[in-house]
Regions:
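Glycine-rich beta-alpha junction loops
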Residues: 44, 131-132, 204-209, 246, ...
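C-terminal active-site "lid" helix and adjoining low-complexity regulatory extension at the edge
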Residues: 349, 354-388
Length: 411
C-alpha cells in the first residue's frame, strides 16, 4: 500500500454535522485518510469552536484550526426548511453522516437516522454523544471534563494525597473521536459485504471507561477501586517520575533484568546486593523507601544526563518535555508529523499531521482548515450537480441563513 496509489478512503463522502472536538477530530482523521469531508456549519457563526480562544491567528481560532484540516465548509441553517431539504439531498449523495448532538436532536430536526436511511439505505450514520443513545443517563450532555470525572479516570489520576486530576489534553473528546473513526471504518467494511449501511452509536462514557483496562480488571478481581499513586506504577518500581537538577524525567525499571542494568549503570552494587530489592514484587512493596534513596541522587545532575545514561544501557527512560519541545522535536520533523501549511487568514500555519504511514511514507500535505461557508457553492455543484438557479432557490428557502456571505467564493 502506498499513498501514490490513492488515499484509502478516496471517493468516500462524509457529511460532518459535528462541532467542537469529538466529532471534528473523528472526521479529520477520516479526512486524513482521503475521505471527502463536508463540514456543515451554522451560517452566521459556524462551529462554536471558531470562537474559542485566545490564541487567535488572523482572526482564526487555534482551537478550531487544530481539528479541522482536510475538510470543506458548507454553511447551512439546519432549522430552515430549505436547510433540512438540502441535508436530506446531501445525505442521499453521501456515504457517511457523523453528528455529535445530544440524542434526539437530529430527530427533532427531522433529520434522524430513520429519515436519512429512507433516503439512502447505504448510509452509515454515526452519532456521538456523552452517554450514548440508551440507558438512564442518555439525555445528559457530554463535556470533556465531566466525562473525565464520570469515567473514573480522574479518580486514578493525580498524587495520592492530592485531589482528582484531569488529563492535560481533552482526552475524553479525543478518544471518543478515535473510536468513532474506527467504528465508521468498520461500518464501511461491513457495507462492502452487505450493501447496507447502518447506525453507529459512540458514547464518551463508554470510550473513556474502556481506557480503564487493568484498573477495571483490578476492581473486578479484588472488589477494591484502585487509588491514585501520582506517576508511580501500582506493581513496578522504580517506574515513575523523578526530578533532575534542571527538569523531570520518567524512569521505567520494568523487570529484574532492567534492575540489574540499572544498579550497574548507577554504580550501586549495594542496591543489587540488597535482598529486600531482589524481586520486582519486593521493590514495588518498598516503593517509597526506594524512591527516597534515588531522589537525592537524581537531583544532582541534569535531565539529559540521566536520559542519556539510561538510554545507553537500554533502560526505559524519557524526558518530560514541554509542548513546545515536542512541537519542535527533530523526531517529529523527520517523520513528517510536524509540518506547516498556508492559510489565507492565519498565514503560515504549523500543525501536527496525520500519524498514519504506508510503506514508510507519510501522508501527503493536508488541505488547510476551511473558512466558514467557503465551499458552499463548490460542494452543491460537485455533490448534487446544482446550477446557480437551484442554489439561489435554496437561498430563497433560507437554507443558508440570513447572510449571503456563505455564497461568496472565498468567504
Amino acid at each position: 500500500m502506498h499513498w501514490s496509489d490513492g488515499a484509502p478512503l478516496q471517493g468516500v463522502k462524509i457529511l460532518d454535522l459535528c462541532r467542537v472536538v469529538s466529532g471534528p477530530f473523528a472526521t479529520m482523521l477520516l479526512g486524513d485518510l482521503g475521505a471527502d469531508v463536508l463540514k456543515i456549519e451554522e451560517p452566521n457563526n459556524g462551529d462554536e469552536a471558531r470562537t474559542y480562544g485566545p490564541p487567535f491567528v488572523g482572526g482564526e481560532s487555534a482551537y478550531f484550526l487544530s481539528v479541522n484540516r482536510n475538510k470543506r465548509s458548507c454553511a447551512v441553517d439546519l432549522k430552515s426548511e430549505g436547510g433540512k431539504e438540502l441535508i436530506l439531498r446531501l445525505a442521499s449523495a453521501g456515504d457517511v453522516v457523523i453528528e455529535n448532538f445530544r440524542p434526539g436532536t437530529m430527530e427533532r430536526l427531522g433529520l434522524g437516522f430513520e429519515t436519512l436511511r429512507k433516503a439512502n439505505d447505504r448510509l452509515v450514520y454515526c452519532g456521538i454523544s456523552g452517554f450514548g443513545r440508551s440507558g438512564p443517563e442518555a439525555n445528559r450532555p457530554g463535556y470533556d471534563l465531566i466525562l473525565q470525572g464520570e469515567s473514573g479516570v480522574m479518580d486514578i489520576t493525580g498524587d495520592a494525597d492530592g485531589p482528582p486530576t484531569k488529563v492535560g489534553t481533552s482526552i475524553a473528546d479525543l478518544v471518543t473521536g478515535l473510536y468513532a473513526a474506527q467504528a465508521v471504518l468498520a461500518a464501511l467494511a461491513q457495507r462492502q459485504r452487505t450493501g447496507k449501511g447502518g447506525r453507529v452509536d459512540v458514547s464518551m462514557l463508554d470510550s473513556m471507561a474502556s481506557l480503564l483496562t487493568f484498573n477495571a480488571g483490578m476492581y473486578y478481581t479484588s472488589g477494591k477501586s484502585p487509588k491514585r499513586r501520582g506517576n508511580a506504577h501500582p506493581t513496578i518500581s522504580p517506574y515513575e517520575t523523578f526530578q533532575a537538577s534542571d527538569g523531570w524525567f520518567n524512569l521505567g525499571v520494568a523487570n529484574d533484568r532492567f534492575w540489574a542494568s540499572f544498579c550497574k549503570v548507577m554504580d550501586r552494587p549495594d542496591l543489587m546486593a540488597e535482598p529486600r530489592y531482589a524481586r520486582a514484587a519486593d521493590r514495588a512493596a518498598l516503593r517509597s523507601e526506594l524512591k527516597a534513596v534515588l531522589e537525592p541522587i537524581f537531583r544532582e545532575r541534569p535531565r539529559d544526563y540521566w536520559t542519556a545514561l539510561f538510554a545507553g544501557a537500554s533502560i526505559p527512560c524519557g524526558a518530560i518535555k514541554s509542548v513546545g519541545e515536542v512541537c519542535e522535536a527533530p523526531q517529529l520533523v523527520a517523520r513528517g508529523v510536524a509540518r506547516s501549511m498556508q492559510h489565507p487568514a492565519a498565514g503560515d500555519l504549523r500543525y501536527l499531521a496525520s500519524t498514519v504511514r504506508f510503506d514508510d511514507q507519510p501522508p501527503p500535505d493536508a488541505r488547510r482548515p476551511p473558512l466558514l461557508g467557503e465551499h458552499t457553492n463548490e460542494i452543491l455543484t460537485e455533490w448534487l450537480s446544482m446550477d446557480d438557479a437551484e442554489i439561489a432557490n435554496f437561498a430563497d428557502k433560507g437554507a443558508f441563513g440570513k447572510s449571503e456571505a456563505s455564497l461568496k467564493e472565498g468567504v
